[in-house]
Amino acid sequence: MGEINRRNFLKASMLGAAAAAVASASAVKGMVSPLVADAADIVAPITETSEFPYKVDAKYQRYNSLKNFFEKTFDPEANKTPIKFHYDDVSKITGKKDTGKDLPTLNAERLGIKGRPATHTETSILFQTQHLGAMLTQRHNETGWTGLDEALNAGAWAVEFDYSGFNAAGGGPGSVIPLYPINPMTNEIANEPVMVPGLYNWDNIDVESVRQQGQQWKFESKEEASKMVKKATRLLGADLVGIAPYDERWTYSTWGRKILKPCKMPNGRTKYLPWDLPKMLSGGGVEVFGHAKFEPDWEKYAGFKPKSVIVFVLEEDYEAIRTSPSVISSATVGKSYSNMAEVAYKIAVFLRKLGYYAAPCGNDTGLSVPMAVQAGLGEAGRNGLLITQKFGPRHRIAKVYTDLELAPDKPRKFGVREFCRLCKKCADACPAQAISHEKDPKVLQPEDCEVAENPYTEKWHLDSNRCGSFWAYNGSPCANCVAVCSWNKVETWNHDVARIATQIPLLQDAARKFDEWFGYNGPVNPDERLESGYVQNMVKDFWNNPESIKQ
């Protein structure tokens, strides 16, 4: 039998077998996982593309990082008018209750404001004050928001807050952190901090020394360099790694650093913050200090022009994410943010010791998702996150820019966009209704976008003001869209089922149901997740299970 005829025969056979297999949850889980995997490879093969896989209009302009939800917080202009949603009432679009439209008023009431909704700045600072532990959440002492849960969250975020410069919000160039000097003769710690570089450190002073001594490591080829760098990146802590070519389209058009000012804390120490926390806590309102702005000049701030970007992914804990929107789910996000800085710093040191320049970055400096797509790590999903084949959206992305020329990976397609068109589970699970219910992505025009979105690229609309408003109300980040995602599994056969479902007309309408039949993820409805006791039970399971569920 010829190869083409054999393939067609196998495809037809696999379609029938796979359709029968996915009809029985127990059969799939216990007996026919290899069959499903084989079927997926034939029915929905993984493909590589040489070009960026999504449309980018000629009108596209680089994204201004100061427009993202958290960076916009520190623009004093954002504190003058109520926060604005792109759609005032999404029930007119979805036909379902808009669970997010009242959040600005509820958040204002938390701040003691009567008669108007909260501003963008008030909304974000309400979240950040609770997130830092300086203000109790409204669910304080409920299961998932207890002092034990909050302490775990604080520990998980500690490196990001204390040693990374809180670049989770964006920023650049590099990071700056306040540290308290210690007198080595008396062991006394100063009350006033000094500003020093954080883990996202762009100091490349050692590189020239290595080169001048003739010690720069020479790889035999770009391919060998990529192989060695990827191996090192995994050893240094990354779960997934890919190489993207440097693409200026994804570098922010403006870099910015939050202006920090000294605030006297109740313990007498001085803490440098981008908002006046004591004033807020005493009922004096929310005051922010703005940004220092920088042109994105690589040579000026990092000493080199990038040629390659090492993009890596860190897995988030499956059990912790299941507890969303509890503080436990925030803790695994914080752990990944803390680890992002550590791993990126170690990769940068590795490159510098080889005699190559490096700039380690988290969410700052450039757009991580399109770089990760270019690096072959996954596809962009409905929820705006990178969907990887192994972890789905349950991860965080960081990157290291370098002047070492590496052989780039290619973008990969494995059925995510086709599945997202059919599923819409993340949109249904969002408490703020921030995720589009439209079936297909499109090249967004300015009128389709809220202020934090960049038009002229192909994607689904997201309203970060709605998302951020729920975070403020919840007192903690929300990961519902990650928790319920059909790609968020620890058994990869489920991903194969998802790929197959997008290719079989009889199964397409049931695509999102498969993992629900198999007992994953809990309720999709955000109110039901809490009211049914599901979240509380997942929190108890998290604390009572001594071993983490691993991929």
UniProtKB/Swiss-Prot annotation:
Catalytic activity from the UniProt record: trichloroethene + chloride + A + H(+) = tetrachloroethene + AH2; trichloroethene + AH2 = (Z)-1,2-dichloroethene + chloride + A + H(+)
EC number: 1.21.99.5
Pfam families assigned: Fer4_16, TAT_signal
Signal peptide location: 1-39
MF terms (GO), sorted A to Z: 4 iron, 4 sulfur cluster binding; metal ion binding; oxidoreductase activity
Role description: Catalyzes the reductive dechlorination of tetrachloroethene (PCE) to trichloroethene (TCE) and of trichloroethene to cis-1,2-dichloroethene (DCE). Can also use trichlorofluoroethene, tetrachloromethane, hexachloroethane, tetrachloroethane, trichloroethane and 1,1,1-trichloro-2,2,2-trifluoroethane. Menaquinone can act as the electron donor. Reduced methyl viologen can act as the artificial electron donor.
Protein name listed in UniProt: Tetrachloroethene reductive dehalogenase
Protein's organism: Dehalobacter restrictus (strain DSM 9455 / PER-K23)
Lineage: Bacteria, Bacillati, Bacillota, Clostridia, Eubacteriales
The encoding gene: pceA
